[in-house]
Amino acid sequence: MMMRFLSAVVIMSSAMAVGLVSAQRCGSQGGGGTCPALWCCSIWGWCGDSEPYCGRTCENKCWSGERSDHRCGAAVGNPPCGQDRCCSVHGWCGGGNDYCSGSKCQYRCSSSVRGPRVALSGNSTANSIGNVVVTEPLFDQMFSHRKDCPSQGFYSYHSFLVAAESFPAFGTIGDVATRKREVAAFLAHISQATSGERSDVENPHAWGLCHINTTTVTENDFCTSSDWPCAAGKKYSPRGPIQLTHNFNYGLAGQAIGEDLIQNPDLVEKDPIISFKTALWFWMSQHDNKPSCHDIVLNANSAANRIPNKGVIGNIISRAFGHDDFAVRSSSIGFYKRYCDMLGVSYGHDLKYWFDNTPSSEFQRIQMRVAA
């Protein structure tokens, strides 16, 4: 579903080259309002992301509190980096061009930015997604069978929005059409993974989010990596919207969202917020220094002349299960087109290319090899 349809990185105006500024008021001088994710509130009551807003004249959400391990980015909740330090595309805080310039920088950048960052209309990413992209009535229409199929309403709209708050870049980058396409692509992938492959029903693309656990009966415990010692008696089988699989993926996902999923892998099938977070973690995270699905959808790595094609995506998602067949591709594209139609947005360019050349169905049984 990750498609070559999105616009090139927007060239920011000279006024924004040293930091993004919004007309949004905040703090004690701005009526008590708060700034969007990754922005700071100055003592004068305005939101921005440069030194005057986040440094010595900052009132709240300031440049401070860099993690002791110096990690940053969506995989760890987008924590701040210290003053004069930036978050690189590989998820580390640091200074200099390797962290702060152009396509190498993820946020807190010193010169250019990798893509348009949008000041949210409310106080949270969830508020933005809910108000601008997917409303609750529309979500219920998209997944009209989720309450009467095996998942029994487990995947709620509220859980989706709460989980999205931990990944503020999801569905908030670019214009409204771009944001809608990213959400449509994400929802299409998790729908394909959880549909139970209902090809025998009248409208199979209305049956997303129907399963929590894998529908394949197996005794495999998926304890495949010595880097993440498995808990006694636990299985790391496919669970949740993205069908998270293998102990190393449970370990890394849990580390990113602050849950011990090695000791408690069942949380992915019992807590819907955690379940959605694991899917968003996979979507937003870079694996083995490859671009994330989010980046590929946004064509964020175009500056490095890396066309998001089968080769790039294939480096992120392995083909171990061999589900790259026409029927699954057709089902995936069907979900995507249905959601785009419901969101009132075009499909984008080169749709046939993407589904003929991208093993998108591997999202159905996640097997990505990531560094522990």
Curated annotation (Swiss-Prot):
Region (Spacer): 113-128
Signal peptide: 1-23
One GO MF term attached to the UniProt entry: chitin binding
InterPro entries registered for this protein in UniProt: Chitin-bd_1 (IPR001002), Chitin-binding_1_CS (IPR018371), Endochitinase-like_sf (IPR036861), Glyco_hydro_19 (IPR016283), Glyco_hydro_19_cat (IPR000726), Lysozyme-like_dom_sf (IPR023346)
Residues annotated to bind substrate: 24, 42-53
SS bond list: 26-41, 35-47, 40-54, 58-62, 72-87, 81-93, 86-100, 105-109
Glycosylated sites: 123
UniProt-listed GO biological process terms: cell wall macromolecule catabolic process; chitin catabolic process; defense response to fungus; killing of cells of another organism; polysaccharide catabolic process
Binding residues for Zn(2+) 2: 90
Reaction catalyzed: Random endo-hydrolysis of N-acetyl-beta-D-glucosaminide (1->4)-beta-linkages in chitin and chitodextrins
Spans annotated as Chitinase: 129-372
Keywords of the record: Antimicrobial, Carbohydrate metabolism, Chitin degradation, Chitin-binding, Disulfide bond, Fungicide, Glycoprotein, Glycosidase, Hydrolase, Lectin, Metal-binding, Plant defense, Polysaccharide degradation, Pyrrolidone carboxylic acid, Repeat, Signal, Zinc
EC number(s) reported in the record: 3.2.1.14
PROSITE patterns: CHIT_BIND_I_1, CHIT_BIND_I_2, CHITINASE_19_1, CHITINASE_19_2
Superkingdom of the organism of origin: Eukaryota
Expression by tissue: Rhizomes and inflorescence with immature seeds.
Annotated binding of Zn(2+) 1, by residue: 70
Description of how the protein assembles with itself and partners: Monomer and homodimer. Zinc favors dimerization. Active in the monomeric form but probably inactive in the dimeric form. The interaction with glycans on the mammalian TCR and MHC molecules of the T-cell and antigen-presenting cell, respectively, is inhibited by oligomers of GlcNAc.
Purpose: Functions both as a chitinase and as a N-acetyl-D-glucosamine binding lectin. Inhibits the growth of several phytopathogenic chitin-containing fungi. Also possesses insecticidal activity and superantigenic properties.
Protein name: Lectin/endochitinase 1
Taxon lineage: Eukaryota, Viridiplantae, Streptophyta, Embryophyta, Tracheophyta
